[in-house]
Amino acid sequence: MQLNSLGFPRIGRRRELKFALEKYWRGESTQAELHEVARELRRTHWQWQVAAGIEQVPVGDFAFYDQVLTLSATLNAIPDRHRGEGAIDLDTLFRVARGRAPTGTDAPASEMTKYFNTNYHYLVPELKQDQVFSIAYEQFFDEVAEAQALGYKAKPVLLGPVSYLYLAKTVGQDFDKLSLLPNLLKAYAEILARFAAQGVTWVQLEEPILALELTHEWQAAISESYQALKTAQVKILLTSYYGSISHHQALVSALPVAGLHLDLVTAPEQLALFANALRPDQILSVGVVNGRNVWAAEVDLIVERIGSVARDLCSQDGSRLWIGTSCSLLHSPVDLEVETTLAPTLRQQLAFAKQKLLELANVRQLLQAPESVAAKEIVNTCLARREAKAQAADAKVIARVAALTPADYERVSEFTERQAVQQRKYRLPLLPTTTIGSFPQTPAIRGLRSRWRKGELSDAQYTEQLQQVTRDTIDRQLKLGIDVLVHGEAERNDMVEYFGEQLEGVGFTKNGWVQSYGSRCVKPPLIYGDVSRPKAMTVDWAVFAQSLTDKPVKGMLTGPVTILHWSFAREDISRDTIATQLALAIRDEVVDLQHAGIGIIQIDEPAFREGLPLKQSEWQAYLDWAVNAFKLSAAGVVDETQIHTHMCYSEFNDTIAAIAAMDADVITIETSRSRMELLNAFEDFEYPNEIGPGVYDIHSPNTPSVEAMVHLIEKAAQKVPVRQLWVNPDCGLKTRTWDEVEPALKNMVDATRELRRRLG
């Protein structure tokens, strides 16, 4: 009974890779020094895995930027603009990812987008109609040799051919990506032959698209691919993750592969279905430890769930069952051992990547020797952990959720009635101008926060300094002539962490970093218990800012769905229950802001779409509870209080009904890069509420002209009635400088005034 590691985080437990990359990019180290850091990380991570009982270490999970990009380089699928004169090398990959590198000519970076429904981002392969695939980069093979030289048995892991094509985009002429499959399969066959020549036994080919609802053409591509690769002199472990593949069971079970890996964390019900169809010569790898979360596995319950199938397989041949993580541990922080300041009650609930390896060994221990002393200790630990969790439950929060009624989710009046009341109260001009919330987080502001956290500034000194920043932010907006102001969020380091630090049931780590892309790492909050708000979180800052002007200043909050999706959320209750608890906490803040005289309140939901399940047939169930969570957070106010929300997506057509159901008085969205084409969804749906389509791209340092913004506002007015329109940037301005922000906002206000003159 082997233990199966699908992949391990590459960043290092103290983000060693991040710092080495950035040092190299700044020109402060050599490529040889960067490679040495990478080798040491791989060596350490392999050592940990072998020490935990992993017999075949994953190789190919390490990447200097992104594993999909590494595969593109291996396949010679690099855009021409990034190639340079010589062979593909590491700097080539950096030019693809970042648009520049220490060597070579700068060129626009490739597109980056989220990997399925995770918060990890991959570089989208760009494929031409005449694309020729061939081995052009040696990293995979070099690392196999490196592992073998250290005495380890290597199991290469790489994205399968069909998922690779699915994730790619076509460039140049419009054509069917699947027309490239035959040539791609020849390259994959060559890769597998190279692995075989190195003495590799097993290769993990990942086809995460199996968790999607695939068309007939893509299903046929799966079948064609693995028929073509069946002659390889290596054993293929066909690997799925992020969801059930039971809807493709007949297809998958017929494939000529030596083994199959199932994600039993997201879809435990598929075990029996595939186990019953397993051929006598196949192995089954069961992904039972969650690779995407931080919570200690309930090992005893896992064994209860898989026990009968496991015993049946092992009675035939003990080597036919592998115990694995649900997916790569890439999505988990590296090592709990470096967390020295966590409360013991929270620490005992956690397992990071290194600890999850030991959990695999614990599952095997319970399966093989359930009566042993070690097994009984494992069970007792699980029981004690669950008992502690039960004792920590907040009865008041649970009772409050249980007592909710349908009326708690609805505003007092319909939108048209609220709109009339709000227009009389605020008397805003046609095309009111506003911003999305944050203003530049200058080095001075970051320095203040750092000194305060170190104890070099008292709370009073810190508050006084930030009040001066807020005065300046309000003053700048008044001089620009913006209609609805914001306080600028100088006191906030992160839009989720700021709220999480003030909520009961939410904790934070010092080193719980996970890779988002390249050298960018994030440290998500831990929602470990029932969530409540012990006291007001933003009211003082909103009231202070409002005291500086007669113009309305928006209260700024992060919505419950976004806080949930950007956190590691507990697994012992449903995600919709957690969202409801968060919504009640935000609702309390909304009500307090209203009572303090803040009449316009924005509840941001940038991650609303990120929670959509991979299978479209499951979308509605998610949208129902996500919409309800937002409505619950916003519904406790009177008609005069205007609720805004902000979303930044590239697609609205398939969720426009849900967005309308949220019933925000005003929604601001990211549209400038699409030249307002995204508004087609709102036009076709006849979206009833007010909308602020972004009129300039805040991600660019360029100053948009008055004429360009006039044109965009006019385009928007062709799609949405002008009296429903607001004017605003695409997103928050936190990452820009004041030298960039002020000219852009001045032009935005001037463009709006020009249109008001034209429209009378």
Curated annotation (Swiss-Prot):
GO terms for molecular function: 5-methyltetrahydropteroyltriglutamate-homocysteine S-methyltransferase activity; zinc ion binding. 5-methyltetrahydropteroyltri-L-glutamate binds at residues 15-18, 114, 520-521, 566, 610. L-methionine binds at residues 436-438, 489, 604. Keywords: Amino-acid biosynthesis, Metal-binding, Methionine biosynthesis, Methyltransferase, Repeat, Transferase, Zinc. L-homocysteine binds at residues 436-438, 489, 604. GO terms for biological process: methionine biosynthetic process; methylation. Pathway: Amino-acid biosynthesis; L-methionine biosynthesis via de novo pathway; L-methionine from L-homocysteine (MetE route): step 1/1. InterPro entries: Cbl-indep_Met_Synth_N, Cobalamin-indep_Met_synthase, Met_Synth_C/arc, UROD/MetE-like_sf. Zn(2+) binds at residues 646, 648, 670, 731. Binds 1 zinc ion per subunit. The active site is at 699 (proton donor). Pfam families: Meth_synt_1, Meth_synt_2. Belongs to the vitamin-B12 independent methionine synthase family. Catalyzes the transfer of a methyl group from 5-methyltetrahydrofolate to homocysteine resulting in methionine formation. This is 5-methyltetrahydropteroyltriglutamate--homocysteine methyltransferase. It comes from Shewanella oneidensis (strain ATCC 700550 / JCM 31522 / CIP 106686 / LMG 19005 / NCIMB 14063 / MR-1). The gene is metE.
